Amino acid sequence: MEERKLRFAIPKGSLEQDTLKLLQAAFYEVKGADRSYRPSISDREISLKILRPQEIPVYVQDGLHDIGITGSDWVLETGADVEVLRDLEYGRVRLVFAAPASDDSTSIGQFLERRLSRGLPVRISTEYLNITARTIAQNPVYRRYFGEMRPMIVTPWYRVGENEKVGIYLSFGATEAKPPEEADAIVDNTETGRTLEQNNLRIVEQIMESSATLIANKEALKDPWKREKILDVLSMFAGVIESRRRLHVFLNVREENLQELLSILPGLKSPTISRLAAPGWY
């Protein structure tokens, strides 16, 4: 009988190293990730595949993988129908609307108003076509000018949307380099904002925050064997995440100072106390 395996997609790129550290901390030994997209893992019931985080939500949705780690931004961008199991609390970035530093707009609405009121087109470069299109289409200023018309989404292969005055252009990277020649503004993720500043851009408005997220295929969760295995992985990750929030402090204290110390030490219920061999000490 063929051995069953849980198919686990992990992200390449900026999330990769922290993901490997999480797996290691959860007692999964991963080998070959630096030279193969199919690294080995110490759990024989799991198979790993390294993929771009942009791809993982749809592959998990379609059952090509049972679980995956990706950014919550890409779950939203793809609209994938997956079960979000847990925020893994690393890879935190902000998705922001940014414009040239010479523009002092304080909101997306103000930026749109200043251009549209002068009859100027709006060109936005981004990897996040759907999030950007929704954000712009729902903006009150945009709706006042164009109602229900959809912004034009532009890629090398297709154009969708009715409104050519507001174009959202697919970026294949180096998005911060697009303004002012190819774009009037961008939507991109940033951790510190330094790269934007170095390219003479400033943040106009934050759209969302994103972090690494564990997701699962909904059908896989209905399979008893896969569900149990997925919950095992989730439990191991949860243990690592919770342990990172806490400190283990070991100290010796005289018996007469014990109650005073207990009054200030935190714990899940109470600190663990052991009496030492020496009289009057813990």
Say what each PLM segment does.
Residues 1-50, 69-83, 87-92, 103-109, ...:
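Small-molecule-sensing regulatory modules
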Residues 98-100:
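Glycine/small-residue-rich phosphate/adenosyl-binding loop
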Residues 45-65:
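Short, structured active-site "lid" loops
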